[in-house]
Design a protein with these regions (language model features):
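Cysteine-centered catalytic environments shared across enzyme families
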Residues: 1-215
């Protein structure tokens, strides 16, 4: 938990989970070599910003302005649950909003802010920070390709234990995911579609929730 990690170092003014973003940003900027990364090249700077954003395990879309340095950082979570749009006016100014209508008439060009991306004013342009090997089918195919008959035979023998392990992994991952979302500082509920998935999520939420889960 980010708040607990920095509790003795930063004085949090609110109970909002959004405030932890400031802690992560300050830690990133406190690195003695961060300013030099801007001049060392895009790869080093990108890696450091990506490292910070990877620590945010949840739903988010934010624009952080650093008044001391006159720079900003905009980012959106990997799934893109919260809407976010970015636009540019004729003078090259960057505008960002959670509703498209806020940018209409203000920009020469606007577009959705891509999920899993960030925009840092010192290195303009949307850049992907969230990357996984399963993004590409070819990469996964190569990773799990059966090389020979012996390996295939071994896998058949181990199929049942592996299946049981996979079921447990899915169970544990689902519970951990739902439990993590229950850390929200605002009221939450479950939208029931009548299917199995929403029912399972509701059951897990009820198991770990300290308050009544609304539907």
């Amino acid at each position: 938990d980010i708040r607990a990690r920095f509790a003795g170092k930063y004085q949090y003014q609110t109970g909002s989970d959004c405030e932890v973003i400031l802690s992560l940003y300050r830690e990133m900027r406190a690195d003695s070599d961060f300013d030099t990364l801007i001049y060392k090249g895009e790869d080093a700077l990108h890696a450091r910003i990506s490292k910070m954003l990877e620590e945010l395990n949840g739903i988010f879309a934010f624009a952080l302005y650093d008044a001391e340095r006159d720079e900003f950082l905009i980012a959106r979570d990997p799934i893109g649950v919260i809407p976010l749009y970015i636009g540019y006016d004729k003078d090259g100014k960057v505008l960002v909003a959670s509703e498209l209508k806020a940018l209409e008439g203000q920009c020469d060009h606007y577009e959705p802010f891509l999920p899993g991306h960030y925009y840092y004013s010192k290195n303009p342009g949307m850049k992907r920070y969230y990357t996984r090997d399963w993004f590409e089918y070819a990469a996964m195919q190569k990773k799990y390709q059966i090389d020979d008959a012996k390996k295939a035979e071994t896998q058949l023998k181990d199929a049942e234990p592996q299946e049981k392990a996979a079921v447990k992994e899915i169970h544990d991952a689902l519970e951990a995911s739902v439990k993590r979302q229950l850390m929200s500082d605002v009221p939450y509920g479950v939208l029931l579609s009548g299917g199995l998935d929403s029912s399972v999520i509701s059951a897990v939420a009820e198991k770990y929730s300290s308050t009544r889960v609304e539907n």
